């Protein structure tokens, strides 16, 4: 096995009582069995970017993940197509005496891309979820 992974986040600007944040990340993994065959169910090369505006209590964010096709799926495995996934969301944190209460909403896979993960045992049967909305409350104590 060999691979590389990176992740970086930095502040672009400060305005309106908050910070404009940007982040990039990516990974690449390759593996071969002793027989020379490709290791099955490895992820393809992935690159992502994130942009957010955040204050102490509020964050509005968007992120994009681009995954290449997996054309080295391993023996008895099907190749998977590449995809681009776009998510948008907002988080609000309310500090309490017993912990932080986080309210969140996320719009996942905004473009309703068909995504079949090369790492999934079910990729030939069922793709990942299409467009979805996730909202909730998280209490961290």
Segments from the language model and where they lie:
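Short, glycine/charged-rich beta-strand-loop motifs at protein surfaces that mediate ligand recognition
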Residues: 73-80, 87-91
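Short glycine/proline-enriched turns and hinge-like loops at secondary-structure junctions
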Residues: 18-20, 80-81, 99
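Gram-negative outer-membrane beta-barrel transporters
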Residues: 1-73
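Active-site lining segments that contact anionic ligands and/or coordinate catalytic metals
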Residues: 57-59, 83-87, 100-102, 132
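C-terminal beta-signal and adjacent terminal beta-strands/loops
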Residues: 24, 71, 92-141
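Low-complexity, intrinsically disordered short segments enriched for Gly/Pro and polybasic residues
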Residues: 62-64, 78, 106
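Residues on the lipid-exposed face of transmembrane beta-strands in outer-membrane beta-barrel proteins
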Residues: 6-10, 49-53, 88-92, 105, ...
């Amino acid at each position: 096995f060999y691979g590389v992974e990176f992740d970086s986040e930095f502040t672009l600007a400060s305005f309106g009582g908050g910070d404009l944040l940007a982040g990039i990340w990516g990974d690449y993994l390759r593996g071969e069995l002793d027989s020379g065959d490709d290791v099955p169910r490895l992820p393809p090369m992935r690159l992502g970017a994130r942009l957010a505006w955040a204050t102490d209590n509020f964050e509005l964010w968007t992120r994009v993940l681009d995954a290449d096709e997996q054309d080295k799926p391993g023996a008895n495995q099907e190749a998977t197509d590449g995809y681009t996934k776009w998510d948008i969301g907002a988080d609000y944190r309310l500090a309490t005496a017993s912990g932080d209460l986080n309210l969140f909403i996320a719009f996942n896979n905004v473009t309703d891309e068909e995504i079949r993960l090369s790492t999934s045992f079910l990729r030939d049967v069922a793709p990942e979820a299409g467009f979805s909305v996730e909202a909730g409350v998280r209490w961290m104590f």
